[in-house]
Amino acid sequence: MHPILKNIRSQPDQGRAEEHNPELHCGIAGTGGLEEQLRSKQREDRFHKACPPAVDLNRDDTQLYGEGERDLRLKSSACVQLDRTPVTPEDFVPDDMGSRAIRQMEAAKLVRNGQHTRDVERWQHDTYCSHLTQLLVRPLTSLGVMYLADFLNTFVELPPNHTLTMQLVTIINHTSEPTLRRLLKDIGEKDAEGHLKNEWLLQLLSIIEMIFKDEPSERARLTALLTVTNEVALNFSKKASGGNYPTTDRLSKTLTYFRRMIVALLALAESLGCYTNNYCARKPEKRCRTQVEPSDESYMFSLKGALEAPESDEEEEEWIRD
């Protein structure tokens, strides 16, 4: 790794802010940033105070589950038929399996948590589609994707270069996603066999570049990105599960991870594409709004020059118009 990349540090106040305001779910199980937390709080405000908080079965970290238990709970919650009859005191009489009232409350809790988990997955999908749509309609995202893919492929193919390293540092400083920032920092690292450790990121970026080249409309690009996200998440979740078909919670966590990566790549590409445009106003501002008044010494020097060598009438008229 280049010495410059080793010295890159995150913002000094970022660690202190996370200590005071920790994220609800960190790492690969993260469900989003401040927006997701605010939406979660708004949904909780609609619940009655007597109701216990709903649990996301895919990301519940309050207790340990057995292997495949999360998937079994989620699937069984959609098949349970609740008994809507009121509970009587006789239902609390204990039997061999506890009591009928306890079993009824456990079933209601399972159905409620399962429905909440499916709602969370639906909300995440809608949020992901909204973020992709906002990034796809921006005119400079496509150019940023082309530049980012070409630069990263050039960086890993050529030998270590100080100029390319400084350019990579500039790109890293524009990255707001911590995971993508770490991956870009180690983009040129290789394993013992000489293979790139983060080659999957280059392949994912190449697929996104291909989508921008082949698909002409934003709707077609959105559909292609959604399909690629599902296929990549399914492929790597099967690989992480030892070749077996992944459970629902593992597939959901992997899908969330790649959603965050794709959104972060498109946001980085859009910020890089902005460098090509030098925005200027159609009607330039008056000089008094863009320049401060000169000092007395500067004005007296200009006055002395005007007295010693007066300009022509055309230059005087131009100065008056300015």
Curated annotation (Swiss-Prot):
Cleaved at different sites by the viral protease during virion maturation. GO terms for cellular component: host cell nucleus. Keywords: Host nucleus, Late protein, Phosphoprotein, Viral genome packaging, Viral release from host cell. One of its GO terms (biological process) is viral DNA genome packaging. Residues 1-127 are annotated as: Interaction with packaging protein 1. Residues 1-24 are annotated as: Disordered. Pfam families: Adeno_52K. It is found in: Host nucleus. Induction: Expressed in the early phase and late phase of the viral replicative cycle. Part of the genome packaging complex composed of packaging proteins 1, 2 and 3; this complex specifically binds to the packaging sequence on the left end of viral genomic DNA and performs packaging of the viral genome. Interacts with hexon-linking protein IIIa; this interaction is required to promote correct genome packaging. Involved in viral genome packaging through its interaction with packaging proteins 1 and 2. After proteolytic cleavage by adenovirus protease, L1 52/55k protein is removed from the capsid during viral maturation. All late proteins expressed from the major late promoter are produced by alternative splicing and alternative polyadenylation of the same gene giving rise to non-overlapping ORFs. A leader sequence is present in the N-terminus of all these mRNAs and is recognized by the viral shutoff protein to provide expression although conventional translation via ribosome scanning from the cap has been shut off in the host cell. Belongs to the adenoviridae packaging protein 3 family. This is Packaging protein 3. It comes from Snake adenovirus serotype 1.
